[in-house]
């Protein structure tokens, strides 16, 4: 590739095997990136949308340069310039130069070349040259030395996921703590549990919210161990298909060791580079775990919407914080917009997992060319989940209040209360009371009192929350 500045100085002319193109003079990307931008106008989501992926790419290029310098393949001056460029990308500079669409043909070559060209042009300026003067430092020959897209790109994806993993875990943990706090706050609020949307047996609102915390806690524990298990084995050094062609035999170990040091992640070389280059199983499993979390979040949000329904004609056991007016035609209406939004995020994550699964299955022979879609969907799922969990916690969970009187009223009027009374009044009496209550619309307690089956003191003892919400063996009445 050769660059020539145009007379207007607003563009520079770069050349590749397909011909010449005018690249914006101020752009740090080059001709191959520009071709990709022109070819792939698809999702509208550029690589820069995911900063951890950009940082992962820069770290891979830094590690490769370090290894090549140690092996005597890269000059000290070029190594210093590439190192400065990578350091700036890792700090967050120049991310706007990563302009290629996340969805692209070529198995990620456009992303890799976007990184190579940006690093090369930053390095050229550090050396005192102009952008595009690749005769002094070349995107392919120098920045991409001993690499293929097929090992640099998947390694950067794995590293980007690892670098962002703690933030995802922190958001999930904070949400769990918020649910647990509400569980403690509502521990005294007796309410009816429901199965199949029908009254079942009493429980506390605190138990309901603690269960939300527990189920998400299971996912937190799995995610903490899953990412290190799945993503720390990298195929850097395998080059095109895993054979390591065009790389020094010592390069793989050096490059991976340097990458582990640079990133602070416990990266190790893949045991089978052919398998590691062609198989996408780690991404499938990790995405499946994200989907599981999304499914749980959506179910929880369904419950929150049901429990707050009404407020006058629904369940109305809890109040969700009012976030915005709910209708352009119905005055005073307020909708559960935060749980609704989380539901939609969950649907997107579930869809992302399906798309990723199909892309993983779509690989052929020694390479999966669908890896750009895999990267896009998994980074998108993480971004959406993290934002949704933060939103749910900040704008909904911490502000939930209980309608204690309503909860108690529903318990006292529920036919399901006869299950708790059954050991004291006997099955025949309990069945008869339930039938009369259903037919007449009267309350169970009212009928029990009327027939003198239990006195008020006994009823008060039976209806104490601690006696209704945990195992308690009572000899059945004969």
From Swiss-Prot:
Signal sequence annotation: none
Domain of life, per lineage: Bacteria
Keyword Transferase: no
Pfam families listed in its UniProt record: FumaraseC_C (PF10415), Lyase_1 (PF00206)
Residues at the catalytic site: 327 (proton acceptor)
Reaction equations catalysed: L-aspartate = fumarate + NH4(+)
Residues reported to bind L-aspartate: 109, 148-150, 195, 328, 333
Keywords: Lyase
EC id: 4.3.1.1
One Gene Ontology term of the molecular function aspect: aspartate ammonia-lyase activity
Gene Ontology biological process terms in this record: aspartate metabolic process; tricarboxylic acid cycle
Purpose: Catalyzes the reversible conversion of L-aspartate to fumarate and ammonia.
Subunit structure: Homotetramer.
Family from the record: Belongs to the class-II fumarase/aspartase family. Aspartase subfamily.
Protein name as catalogued: Aspartate ammonia-lyase
Organism (species): Pseudomonas fluorescens
Organism placement in taxonomy: Bacteria, Pseudomonadati, Pseudomonadota, Gammaproteobacteria, Pseudomonadales
